[in-house]
Curated annotation (Swiss-Prot):
Its cofactor is Zn(2+). The keyword Lyase does not apply. This is Alanine--tRNA ligase. Its EC number is 6.1.1.7. It catalyses: tRNA(Ala) + L-alanine + ATP = L-alanyl-tRNA(Ala) + AMP + diphosphate. It is found in: Cytoplasm. GO terms for cellular component: cytosol. Catalyzes the attachment of alanine to tRNA(Ala) in a two-step reaction: alanine is first activated by ATP to form Ala-AMP and then transferred to the acceptor end of tRNA(Ala). Also edits incorrectly charged Ser-tRNA(Ala) and Gly-tRNA(Ala) via its editing domain. It comes from Alkaliphilus metalliredigens (strain QYMF). It is an enzyme of class 6 (ligase). Keywords: Aminoacyl-tRNA synthetase, ATP-binding, Cytoplasm, Ligase, Metal-binding, Nucleotide-binding, Protein biosynthesis, RNA-binding, tRNA-binding, Zinc. Zn(2+) binds at H566, H570, C668, H672. Consists of three domains; the N-terminal catalytic domain, the editing domain and the C-terminal C-Ala domain. The editing domain removes incorrectly charged amino acids, while the C-Ala domain, along with tRNA(Ala), serves as a bridge to cooperatively bring together the editing and aminoacylation centers thus stimulating deacylation of misacylated tRNAs.
């Protein structure tokens, strides 16, 4: 058997199926397109679901892919075993109502034996126990000996998820030999030992399972095969671990160099090295596909993987950010097959670095919180940290349990690991439920799915704002009806419509539909499946029936304002790329009649100078009166024109190209002005961050821009009037006022501090002796927390021995400060525990060390009541 590299196997597979007249589809992004049932693409067939269900038409009846996938369900096992990984590539061949079992099995056998050159006697096959057809193909056409064809039950060899398309499958196994065997005479595929490795699953989707559990034959059966690239590479390279495959080994070696460690040194080191290697690959691909770190959804998955890898770097002794430097190794290894990694290399590296640096801060934050909690435990004479708190540190702050245990051991403390594991299991169960609930979501039907697939809509809104259309369907309360009447809110599908459906960030059109005695208000328009456009209608008068011909008219002003903003968005996108950098990618947009919102990839806020440059450039192109033209072209032709495609968007063979002069070329299905001069004026309102590595610009055009400028002018005139200053002198006058105010505030603070210090001797007269310990409690009027601490420290020096509890009002809130001398702390006094009870009465909380603590409260009127309990708290602490 010839030894082959992973990249070589990938190319060989795709070339083989291209020869078999399959359309070779580049890997879809890891972010599912229009599929809310999945967080991330986790299987080769996942992006093709709509082709299997018939909702969308595939580019060819035969397809082949090498699909990027992410699975994190078993993340805790990654690193601990040699086969678990979060990122993997799935080779797949598919047929939609074309060839079936015979060709699928024959070509699978041909590729495995002739192209991969696997020994025939090493390959076994399994079939579903009731699938005599597949068994017969293996026995009679492939001529595989009966003893190497295994019949397995539904659990192993029948693919189904709830209701919908399903069918039997046949799997190819590679026999690794006796040394991996369990030793039993009946050892064969299906055994739990490591001898037989399943490497290629052929699913024959020939049934449609209904709600009653019946398996109905599909009129056009499908083929769905999947072969894990890393797994077959293990076979071809005769290695036991995916981390020994050539591509993974290259990354792992660079991790060893960066961490100054050796692989196979010890178990703990191996686990950390594997985790870093796997997670580095995953995060590079995820960021390359437009995912950014966040606290929810797929962004949280990315953040967790990145921080987990960074944490294992710390366990190996790495004290600074290092993952971003290793990313180049992933690009070197996979860049030939995935060009986006090369194109976005600098951007991916920057995002990793920013997130890594943030994690360093997080570790420090978690450490502070843990240390504070340890002090509280000491005060309560506790020596075991509850597992729920440890899990909160882990889950919320990314603070690892290993580090928590290590810190506790230094204080001769432990953590309740069983309680921690219980919380971890609860989280796993939540994740499993989310996954199991989501897996079938994409196959569920609604009233629209039940409609005839020939019901489609032709959009006429590019050419006209008014068009006649025939009512093909009416949906009322998720039921298909033939008739509806005044007062109802329904969704209708027309054969022709001028109403643009919400798509590509542009909101749907509004307007009216009418005929004779009937009138309806179009509240919204959305894109449905199968080239249908849904109009959301409120029936104002009359009756509407399926089959009626009606007039539809789009409200002109909102549409034209939306077009202004949409074309301006294209100009903005181009200006950002030119001024900020080519790494800028659209990460989201919203185009309404009132404003535009544009989210884009960039790792830091834009300076005022850069924003001014962007705004100026867009306005210059508006003044240049550029013609806006649209052309239909093939995807390849559009790319040759230099058209900007939206990353992650799913495009067909033919696309619509929007050209704004020679300045901007984008793939876009939206509506636009005819000439850039129609936009009028472009004005940026704000630039903010919405997530790590994602910035947002909000802007207005046309009349909205004019009205905004007039409002701003009005405000400036009012300020000029108040300050009795005109024009250019306004800024200077405001600076003078701010300087004067700052100086007055400083003088006021100095006076307050002086008065407070002058009254210290008077305050010392209020000392009481409780159980042989000095106690000084005082309620000031208004003092900042900083002043309260300074006064407390001064009193502490003067008192020599004892406890000081102070309260004051600051910014309409209560502030408390408690401090105790060392000798009193040794008697059992704990300032942090004391102040927590005090602050509760004023509607707040806080804590701190035994010798010093501060807290706040929402109710300043309760400061005196809160301070009144200090005497009792001190007695309790002194008496143990």
């Amino acid at each position: 058997m010839k030894k082959m590299g992973l990249n070589e196997i990938r190319k060989l597979f795709l070339d083989f199926y291209e020869e078999k007249e399959h359309y070779v589809q580049s890997s879809y992004p890891l972010v599912p397109h229009n599929d809310k049932s999945l967080l991330l693409i986790n299987a080769g067939m996942a992006p093709l679901k709509n082709y299997f269900s018939g909702v969308e038409t595939p580019p060819s009846k035969r397809m082949a892919t090498c699909q990027k996938c992410i699975r994190t369900g078993d993340i805790e096992n990654v690193g601990k075993t040699s086969r678990h990984a979060t990122f993997f590539e799935m080779l797949g061949s598919f047929a939609f109502g074309d060839y079936f079992k015979t060709e699928s099995i024959q070509w699978g056998w041909e590729f495995a034996t002739k192209y991969l050159e696997m020994p025939e006697d090493k390959i076994w096959a399994s079939v579903y126990e009731e699938d005599d057809e597949a068994y017969g193909i293996w026995e009679n056409q492939i001529k595989m000996p009966k003893e190497r064809i295994v019949r397995l039950g539904k659990e192993d060899n029948f693919w189904e998820i709830g209701v919908g398309p399903c069918g039997p499958c046949s799997e190819l196994y590679f026999d690794r030999g006796d040394k991996y065997s369990c030793g039993h005479d009946d050892c064969k595929p299906g055994c739990d030992c490591d001898r037989f490795v399943e490497f290629w699953n052929h699913v024959f989707t020939q049934f449609d399972k209904d709600e009653a559990g019946n398996y109905n034959l599909l009129p056009n059966p499908n083929i769905d095969t999947g072969m894990g690239l890393e797994r077959v590479a293990c076979i071809m390279q005769d290695v036991d671990s995916i981390f020994e495959v050539d591509t993974m080994k290259h990354i792992l070696n660079s991790v060893c160099t960066a961490t100054n460690t050796q692989y196979n040194k010890d178990v703990k080191t191996n686990i950390s090295l594997r985790i870093i290697t796997d997670h580095l690959r995953s995060i590079t691909f995820m960021i390359g596909d437009g995912i950014l770190p966040s606290n929810e959804g797929r962004g949280y998955v990315l953040r967790r993987l990145l921080r987990r890898a960074a944490r294992h770097g710390k366990l190996l002794g790495v004290s600074k950010s290092f993952l971003y430097e290793l990313m180049d190794t992933v690009t070197e290894t996979y860049g030939g097959a995935y060009s986006e990694l090369v194109e976005k290399k600098d951007y991916i590296k920057k995002i990793i670095q920013v997130e890594e640096d943030r994690f360093q801060e997080t570790i420090h934050q978690g450490l502070e919180i843990l240390n504070q909690h340890i002090e509280e435990m000491i005060g309560k004479s506790e020596n075991m940290l509850n597992g729920t708190y440890a899990f909160k540190l882990y889950d919320t702050y990314g603070f690892p349990l290993d580090l928590t245990k290590e810190i506790l051991e230094e204080r001769e403390m432990t953590v309740d690991e069983s309680e921690f594991e219980s919380e971890m299991e609860k989280q796993r169960n939540r994740a499993r439920k989310a996954r199991s609930g989501g897996d079938t979501e994409g196959w569920k039907e609604d009233a629209f799915d039940a409609l005839d697939k020939n019901i489609q809509t032709s959009f006429k809104g590019y050419e006209t704002l008014r068009a006649e259309g025939k009512v093909l369907a009416i949906i009322e309360e998720n039921q298909s009806v033939n008739l509806t009447s005044a007062g109802k809110e329904v969704v209708i599908v027309l054969d022709k419509t001028p109403f643009y459906p919400e798509s590509g960030g542009q909101i749907g059109d509004i307007g009216h539909i009418f005929k004779d005695e009937f009138e309806g208000q179009v509240l919204d328009t959305k894109q449905g499946k199968n080239q249908r456009i849904h109009q959301y209608i409120k029936i104002l008068r009359g009756i509407l029936q399926v089959g009626d011909s009606i007039q539809g008219e789009v409200d002109k002003e909102p549409r034209h304002n939306t077009e202004r903003n949409h074309t301006a968005t294209h100009l903005l996108h181009k200006a950002l790329k030119g001024i900020i950098g080519e790494h800028v990618e659209q990460a989201g947009s919203l185009v309404t009649p009132e404003k535009l919102r544009f989210d884009f990839s960039h790792f830091e806020g834009l300076s005022s100078a850069d924003l001014s440059k962007v705004e100026l450039e867009v306005n210059q192109e508006i003044l240049n009166a550029l013609n806006v033209d649209t052309v239909e072209a093939s995807l390849e032709e559009a790319k040759k024109m230099g058209a900007m495609a939206l990353f992650g968007e799913k495009y067909g063979d033919d696309v619509r190209v929007v050209k704004t002069g020679d300045y901007s070329v984008e793939l876009c299905g939206g509506t636009h002005v005819k000439n850039s001069s129609e936009i009028g004026t472009f004005l940026i309102l704000s630039e903010t961050g919405v997530a790590a590595g994602v910035r947002r610009i909000e802007a207005v055009t046309g009349q909205e821009a004019y009205h905004h400028i007039k409002r701003e002018q009005g405000l400036i005139q009012d300020i000029e009037s108040l300050l009795k200053t005109k024009g250019e002198q306004l800024t200077k006058r405001v600076e003078e006022l701010l300087k004067e105010t700052k100086e007055k505030d400083k003088e006021l603070q100095q006076l307050k501090s002086k008065l407070a210090n002058q009254s210290i001797d008077e305050i010392l007269n209020q000392i009481e002796v409780i159980e042989g310990t000095n106690l000084l409690v005082h309620h000031f009027g208004e003092q900042s927390m900083e002043d309260l601490r300074n006064i407390g420290d001064s009193l502490k020096q003067k008192i020599g021995s004892g406890v000081i509890a102070l309260g004051a009002e600051s910014n309409d809130k209560a502030s408390f400060f408690v401090t105790a001398t060392k000798d009193v702390v040794e008697k059992g006094v704990h300032s942090g525990n004391m102040i927590r009870e005090v602050a509760k009465i004023a509607g707040g909380g806080g804590g701190g060390r035994p010798d010093m603590a501060q807290a706040g409260g929402k109710n300043p009127e309760k400061i005196q009541s809160a301070l009144s309990i200090v005497k009792g708290l001190l007695k309790n602490q002194l008496n143990g």
